[in-house]
Design a protein with these regions (language model features):
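Catalytic core of membrane glycerolipid acyltransferases/transacylases, capturing the structured
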Residues: 92-110, 121-123, 137-196
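Generic structural signal for residues in well-ordered beta-strands
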Residues: 13-18, 128-130, 274
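Short amphipathic alpha-helices in soluble, non-transmembrane regions
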Residues: 1-3
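AMP-binding/adenylate-forming catalytic domain of the ANL superfamily
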Residues: 7-31, 48-56
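N-terminal membrane-anchoring alpha-helices
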Residues: 67-125, 129
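Acidic/polar alpha-helix N-cap and adjacent early helical turns
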Residues: 38-73
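Non-catalytic C-terminal accessory region of glycerolipid acyltransferases
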Residues: 42, 200-318
Length: 318
């Protein structure tokens, strides 16, 4: 019969199945669940004995609690990592600070800081990927400029950069004993952000010292927030580079904001990417600047910002 039906009509005949009441699966509004009925028929479950109510209720409860249990597991895992991260940090921080305060040579201080920063990243399972490291490993004077995304940017850069630098930090950090000693021993330069006259004097001072042993490193955004995105870059770093006629090396930081955001002390797992660009030489901008220092600073800023925006993985907030 099935063969004749297929020959005459081109389709197999329907299979009529007699099932007990309530065997046809329906929605809460009474509509037939055709896909579910088809699956039950193909698996031989259509018309079988109904499962006990307590079994059905157990399946419903399990289906409802499974996502909650998954969220709970993730929350516990994240909290465990955060506690572990702070324990590791506070175990490494005191000997690191003491080494910075007591070692007599800046090169020794930087070597110790680099070892401790890399050890911290390794113990926390945070991978730091660096591209273009050779661009920063130059013997000539230069100014490095990066975006600022998190409290941990400085630690990451100490671990990632191929040579020591002198971070340019806000003068407010001088008020704290711990920060003042630590940053001063690193060779940091402090600038005033809110006093215009002092800020101008700091800019002139930085322009005069760009040819010293280690290059200056600026976080040109000036600050960071929880909101992802690249903010406008302040001109101080670029004016210093233009006045002293040294190249600017752009550095893009990606991933640190998601690990430790502004206003949060709950570190999370993640990976970090550092993209170091080719030095931007004033000679390559001569057609745009025409020998004018201010135009040179603007051109350096625009080129640097373009590199950072391409590699930081965040939107443009300018």
């Amino acid at each position: 019969i099935n063969g004749m039906t297929l020959d005459l009509m081109g389709v197999p005949c329907d299979d009529v199945v007699l099932v007990p009441p309530h065997a046809v699966l329906k929605t809460s509004s009474g509509k037939i669940r055709r896909a579910a009925c088809s699956d039950a028929y193909e698996q031989g479950r259509l018309g079988g004995a109904a499962r006990p109510v307590w079994v059905q209720l157990g399946h419903v409860v399990l289906a409802a609690t499974r996502p909650a249990l998954h969220r709970l597991r993730r929350s516990v895992s994240a909290a465990t990592f955060a506690v572990y991260a702070w324990i590791v940090f506070w175990l490494l921080a005191p000997p690191t600070w003491l080494a910075a305060a007591l070692l007599p040579r800046p090169a020794w201080v930087w070597s110790t800081l680099r070892v401790m920063a890399r050890l911290l990243a390794r113990l926390l399972g945070v991978r730091i990927h660096v591209t273009g490291a050779s661009h920063a490993a130059v013997d000539t004077a230069s100014v490095l400029v990066a975006n600022h995304a998190s409290y941990i940017d400085g630690i990451v850069l100490v671990a990632a950069l191929p040579q020591p630098v002198r971070f340019v930090a806000k003068a407010e950090l001088l008020r704290g004993f711990v920060a003042r000693i630590f940053l001063s021993r690193m060779g940091a330069e402090f600038v005033e952000r809110f006093n215009h006259e002092a800020s101008s004097a700091d800019a002139r001072r930085l322009a005069q010292i760009t040819h010293m042993q280690y290059p200056l490193f600026f976080f040109a955004e000036g600050t960071f927030t929880r909101v992802p995105g690249l903010r406008p870059l302040h001109l101080g770093a670029f004016v210093a580079a233009a006045e002293s006629v040294v190249p600017v090396i752009p550095v893009a930081i990606r991933g640190t904001r998601s690990i430790l955001r502004d206003g949060s002390w709950f570190p999370r797992r993640g990976a970090i990417h550092i993209a170091i660009g080719e030095p931007i030489d004033l000679a390559s901008l001569s057609s745009e600047t025409q020998g004018d220092t201010w135009r040179a600073a603007l051109a350096l800023r625009d080129r640097t910002r373009s590199h950072i925006l391409r590699h930081c993985g965040e939107p443009d907030l300018s």
